[in-house]
Amino acid sequence: MTIKRKACIAGVYEHPTRHAPDKSLAQLHAEVAQGALADAGLSIADVDAYFCATDAPGLGPMSMIDYMGLKLRHYNSTEVGGASYTVHVAHAAEAIAAGKCSVALITLAGRPRAEGMATGTTPRVYNPAAPDVGFEAPFGPVTANMYALCAMRHMHEFGTASEQLAWVKVAASHHAQHNPHALLREVVTVEEVMASPMIADPLHRLDCCVITDGGGALVVVAPEVAKSLKRPKINLLGAGEASKNPSGGKVDLTYTGARWSGQRAFEEAGVKPGDIQYVSIYDSFTITVVMTLEDLGFCEKGRGGRFVADGNLISGVGKLPFNTDGGGLSNNHPGNRGSMTKVIEAVRQLRGEAHSKVQVKNCALALAHGTGGSIGTRHASATLVLERE
């Protein structure tokens, strides 16, 4: 079953806060839900499907369904880390195409900043019973050093330089300066990225994403519902999912699951990488962006460093503007899960609602990509191709 043009994104909302010590998780979920529904011109009573991941407090989606007073025909709580929300968009479209629902609400919320969570340097053990724990935990894997391993290997194989990775952060900062809600709005240089403290060689502090509270929400609807709303019609053209694993230790750190998820999304959409005018790329670290761009086909494998160092990611300058809200590197990474805001900014670009300084002229085709887990071990990749009708 194809989902091409079988569903539309009608509402988006990003919570303006980046620090929420005064709000509960449930409150944040409800606030972003209200915001996205208001953006779509719909109400809670219109929602007949709800999608969330384990950031939602309580028993799967059940507690938030009760808290928000939802009356549903369908729900889904797929959990694949930071890629969960790009996956949810695809799954919502599938449910709509199958006739299981017509208005799907997707929410994300988190409070890692308020809770003082040391996200990048805490042991990466999700569940002591997981089969991989005994093989990896003794070596002390944390988020930062697993991504650093990928960066180091990419440098060894392809000659990528730290200065090239820094250009990803430079591009993000150029965009974030125009976002009044961005956590970091100061434009930085390659030299400043290189001078920031080393976190896990070769990744510096400014190679790492921000830690923020807040959240976001999306409303995915059937085409007939979209036609009745006073919002630009944003169609889902294609979607792809993939996972990549160490395969019993035979891991290649130079590529990600985007190699497969991107191909599937492009095939369903019937477009090529060269057709895309704007990209939202998961940016947990600068190396994540470089490798993902390569694997999605926007540049040759091993040439991602050169591609970004040529300024290609800066809106108004390069050939492939990315993360024009500032992305996870400068703007927002709510709950340490970045794919929600990637979809939100892609929709803004397609609607022509991004800041005028970063808006892509006549943007009609965009891509949003999420990564969940760690590209250094097992991870999920999910790619969406979106179209303005």
PLM regions and their residue ranges:
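Condensing-enzyme catalytic core mediating Claisen C-C bond formation in acyl metabolism
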Residues: 1-26, 133, 167, 198-260, ...
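Conserved active-site "lid/cap" helical segment
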Residues: 1-83, 91, 95, 150, ...
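Conserved catalytic cysteine-centered active-site region
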Residues: 3-5, 53-146, 184-210, 239-244, ...
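Beta-strand segments within the central parallel beta-sheet cores of soluble alpha/beta enzyme folds
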Residues: 44-53, 74-76, 104-109, 163-170, ...
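Short glycine/threonine-rich loop-to-helix capping motif typified by GTGT followed
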Residues: 56-67, 248-252, 283-306, 313, ...
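Active-site-proximal alpha-helical scaffold in enzymes
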Residues: 80-110, 144-178, 218-224, 333-354
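Molybdopterin (Moco) oxidoreductase catalytic core of the xanthine/aldehyde oxidoreductase family
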Residues: 133-139, 160-164, 180, 303-307
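Extended C-terminal subregions enriched in glycine
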Residues: 255, 259, 263-286, 295-298, ...
